[in-house]
Every structure is written in structure tokens, then in C-alpha cells.
């Protein structure tokens, strides 16, 4: 088990997602509704405990924020909660959207 997360580029995040990694978006609900990585799940302080309780702690987890800053703190938190394979998306959703504009979705969180 790793005790630290890795910072990754959008290309690595996309590959991880295609191989089954869970992508979580920690931005505010309005920003998530306007646009997010296709297949990602919105989580916030109210839903994080339920997410952790139901999660496979050994499955890869990619954390996304606006620009790749807040996701680092969240990724460290997930490591502390027992996740073993955690990544923070450098550049956040803004960089993802510029690299993969067709690989985004809009709409409310599930």
C-alpha cells in the first residue's frame, strides 16, 4: 500500500479511466453540472463518507478539481482513509477540457 498519491497528466488519467479507475470530481455542484469528465462522480463533504464506505479501496482513484490544486489535498485524504492507488489530475478539469473537449459531459450529479 502506498502512503502517497501520484500527480498525473490528463493522458494518464484517461488511460486509467479506460482501464476501470473511478474518477471523482470535488468541484462545486454547479461547476460539475456545467461540465465534467465523462463517467466521473461528484463528491462533496456530504457524500464523501458514503462514497468511502462503498468504495473498493484497492481500485485506482483519480481525483479532479478545477486546476489540480485542491485535488492534491483530497487525494492525500483518500490515502489516509485507506485507498491504496490514488491520483491527482494535474491541471484539473480545465486542462482535461482543453485536451479532451469531446470527453466531457454536463448535467447534475447522480
Curated annotation (Swiss-Prot):
Q: What is this protein called?
A: Thiosulfate sulfurtransferase GlpE
> What sections of the sequence does the record tag as coiled-coil?
none
Task: Tell me yes or no: is Cytoplasm among this UniProt entry's keywords.
Answer: yes
> Which catalytic residues are annotated?
65
- What lineage is on file? Bacteria, Pseudomonadati, Pseudomonadota, Gammaproteobacteria, Pseudomonadales
Listed GO biological process terms: glycerol metabolic process
Q: Would you name any one GO CC term?
A: cytoplasm
Q: Matching Pfam families, A to Z?
A: Rhodanese (PF00581)
Q: Which InterPro entries match?
A: GlpE_sulfurtransferase, Rhodanese-like_dom, Rhodanese-like_dom_sf, Thiosulf_sulfurTrfase
Domain of life where this protein originates: Bacteria
Tell me where in this chain the Rhodanese domain is found: 17-105
Role summary: Transferase that catalyzes the transfer of sulfur from thiosulfate to thiophilic acceptors such as cyanide or dithiols. May function in a CysM-independent thiosulfate assimilation pathway by catalyzing the conversion of thiosulfate to sulfite, which can then be used for L-cysteine biosynthesis.
The EC number on file is 2.8.1.1
Query: Which controlled-vocabulary keywords does the entry list?
Result: Cytoplasm, Transferase
Q: Which CDD domains match?
A: GlpE_ST (cd01444)
Q: Which family does it belong to?
A: Belongs to the GlpE family.
Gene3D superfamilies according to UniProt: Rhodanese-like domain
Q: Which PANTHER family match?
A: FAD-DEPENDENT OXIDOREDUCTASE, THIOSULFATE SULFURTRANSFERASE GLPE
Q: List where in the cell it is found.
A: Cytoplasm
Output one GO MF annotation.
Answer: thiosulfate-cyanide sulfurtransferase activity
* Reactions this protein catalyses: thiosulfate + hydrogen cyanide = thiocyanate + sulfite + 2 H(+); thiosulfate + [thioredoxin]-dithiol = [thioredoxin]-disulfide + hydrogen sulfide + sulfite + 2 H(+)
Q: Which HAMAP family match?
A: Thiosulf_sulfurtr (MF_01009)
Write down the SMART domains for this protein, in alphabetical order: RHOD
